[in-house]
Amino acid sequence: MDKPMKRIFVVLVILLVLPQLALAIRIKDIASFDGVRDNQLIGYGLIVGLNGTGDSDQTKFPVQSLANVLERMGITVNRDDIKVKNVAAVMVTAELPPFSKQGTRVDVLVSSLGDAKSLAGGTLLMTPLKGADGQVYAVAQGGLLTNSFSYGGQAATAQKNHPTAGRIPNGALVERELPNVLADRSQLRLNLHQPDFTTATRIARAVNEQFKAGVASCNDPGSVVISLPDAYQGRVVEFVADMERLEVRPDNPAKVVLNERTGTIVIGENVRIDTVAVSHGNLTLLIKETPRVSQPQPLSRTGETVVVPRTGIKVSEESGGLAVLREGASIGDVVRALNALGVTPRDLIGILQAIKAAGAMQAELSVI
């Protein structure tokens, strides 16, 4: 074999192998360990410093909250004298990542509770954030970013984006650490993001081949149980790091997702169509009202001006083509055939539903 032929052969081999390699995905991208997850935090707080866009006097709880804050600072005020136009009551939420340490910071989201018009330019006062167990895990405080505005008067209002919600980057300080769920464990459970029998089996096989032992087993399609190998005893973190880097090829089910509100269509790679004929045509009905005014003759003593209705109706029907999709047709074949009929995305939604109803689509059809 001469050099040019060798080069061509090598290029062909690479082109054939690359698609298979591209399908391989790291285990850490399709699964996570049991217990290693974010935890939701929530708290109630006050935003101050608003330019007259806070809660109105009709909202009572901001007044009570502000009075309580002032009393804790040693300031006694009459609640009837408090005006809250520059103050807004808000709910503060955050996600506490796993293994967060004391002193680290997380982002917080702030949303108005009352009838405030805008939170732009406000500052969140110190707000404890609690978990589902009622314990305080973080404290939030800082200036709010809304990337919006809202200005108006009695007759007009100008608004950009959503001014009654915003975020504080790194606005919460972690005060309590979560327990280390991986410490002193001899067995780990890996939970798949998309449960699948084939994918779970491939993960277990890849782990067993890498560590030369039967340490991984599947009990169900959603998880893989892994025992810590003897060589990694006392080194759980190192074992997890080595295992997460392993690559497997997930097996995705054939699925078609339709969104009728937006006309969005997502078709999976494994979708197959049996032999079916598809015809498409549009019927357009146009009704137009063009009333005319009928007036009496000039200088006439009889008669009156009346409006005479006139209705025009136009019916047009586009000639529909007929496309035949052969058995085993792939998604590319389906798209090319339907494009040849000149269908729009919204028309395609109805066509795919009809193909599924005819029993010719070997895939799950999900409408959202």
From Swiss-Prot:
> How does the annotation summarize its subunit structure?
The basal body constitutes a major portion of the flagellar organelle and consists of four rings (L,P,S, and M) mounted on a central rod.
Q: State any GO BP term from the record.
A: bacterial-type flagellum-dependent cell motility
Q: What is a GO molecular function of this protein?
A: structural molecule activity
The record's Gene Ontology cellular component field reads:
bacterial-type flagellum basal body, distal rod, P ring; outer membrane-bounded periplasmic space
Name it: Flagellar P-ring protein
Which NCBIfam families does the entry link to?
PRK05303.1
Q: Which family does it belong to?
A: Belongs to the FlgI family.
Where does the UniProt annotation place the signal sequence? 1-24
Cross-referenced HAMAP family, in alphabetical order? Answer: FlgI
Give the organism the record lists.
Geobacter sulfurreducens (strain ATCC 51573 / DSM 12127 / PCA)
* Keywords of this entry: Bacterial flagellum, Periplasm, Signal
Please name the InterPro entries in this protein's record: Flag_FlgI
**Its biological function?**
Assembles around the rod to form the L-ring and probably protects the motor/basal body from shearing forces during rotation.
Places the protein is found: Periplasm; Bacterial flagellum basal body
